[in-house]
Amino acid sequence: MGLLTILKKMKQKERELRLLMLGLDNAGKTTILKKFNGEDIDTISPTLGFNIKTLEHRGFKLNIWDVGGQKSLRSYWRNYFESTDGLIWVVDSADRQRMQDCQRELQNLLVEERLAGATLLIFANKQDLPGALSSNAIREALELDSIRSHHWCIQGCSAVTGENLLPGIDWLLDDISSRIFMAD
């Protein structure tokens, strides 16, 4: 993140953040976003492109970009990297078959220059499903302990029940604000 970007954000009275939500298809990105925003989650279909939600939380204006995760759409992810303050990587904890794909795609993102400095929150979603991998198992599978380029945190959660969505988002906001906003 360049100095001008930091200065611009410090001057803004309205503390506005750009969050990018990515992950493989069917990980639960849209469900997390809708649940966090208090919307109905009964009928959610795959995101073919992207959704943008703007919501207020803890005095922040959050612009959350929810981008489809189908293999055919992943090459377009780079179009959304610019000015990203926080990256939310959503993992389907019950999808053991694709954990290696998930790890590879995350590693590809973390070397992107335009995401340098962005705080990383990993939501280990679908913890309510039988057979879901624990946060620690996902931490190992995704080799998270090797990440040195970003501040990161893994949070087990359930988009369906809403469990642990708030603590994850709160950690993300705390980390971002400690980096880019001056104390009031």
Swiss-Prot record:
One GO term of the biological process aspect: centrosome cycle
Location of this chain's protein in the cell: Nucleus; Mitochondrion intermembrane space; Cytoplasm, Cytoskeleton, Microtubule organizing center, Centrosome; Cytoplasm
Origin superkingdom: Eukaryota
Binding site for GTP: 23-30, 66-70, 125-128
Pfam families per the UniProt record, alphabetical: Arf
Reported modifications of this chain: Not N-myristoylated.
Alphabetized GO MF terms: GDP binding; GTP binding; GTPase activity
Keywords attached to this entry: Cell cycle, Cytoplasm, Cytoskeleton, GTP-binding, Isopeptide bond, Lipoprotein, Mitochondrion, Myristate, Nucleotide-binding, Nucleus, Phosphoprotein, Ubl conjugation
Distribution of this protein across tissues and organs: Expressed in liver and retina (at protein level).
Lipid moiety-binding region (N-myristoyl glycine): G2
Phosphoserine: residues carrying this PTM: S45
Alphabetical list of SMART domains matching this protein: ARF (SM00177), RAB (SM00175), SAR (SM00178)
GO cellular component: centrosome; ciliary basal body; cytoplasm; lateral plasma membrane; microtubule cytoskeleton; mitochondrial intermembrane space; mitochondrion; nucleolus
Cross-link (Glycyl lysine isopeptide (Lys-Gly) (interchain with G-Cter in ubiquitin)): K71
Result of changing Q70L: No effect on tubulin degradation or cell detachment. Does not reduce TBCD-dependent tubulin degradation. Reduces slightly interaction with TBCD
Cited function: Small GTP-binding protein which cycles between an inactive GDP-bound and an active GTP-bound form, and the rate of cycling is regulated by guanine nucleotide exchange factors (GEF) and GTPase-activating proteins (GAP). GTP-binding protein that does not act as an allosteric activator of the cholera toxin catalytic subunit. Regulates formation of new microtubules and centrosome integrity. Prevents the TBCD-induced microtubule destruction. Participates in association with TBCD, in the disassembly of the apical junction complexes.
Subunit structure: Interacts with ELMOD2. Interacts with ARL2BP; the GTP-bound form interacts with ARL2BP. The GDP-bound form interacts preferentially with TBCD. Interacts with UNC119. Found in a complex with ARL2, ARL2BP and SLC25A4. The GTP-bound form interacts with PDE6D. Found in a complex with ARL2, ARL2BP and SLC25A6. Found in a complex with at least ARL2, PPP2CB, PPP2R1A, PPP2R2A, PPP2R5E and TBCD.
Family the UniProt entry places it in: Belongs to the small GTPase superfamily. Arf family.
Protein name per Swiss-Prot or TrEMBL: ADP-ribosylation factor-like protein 2
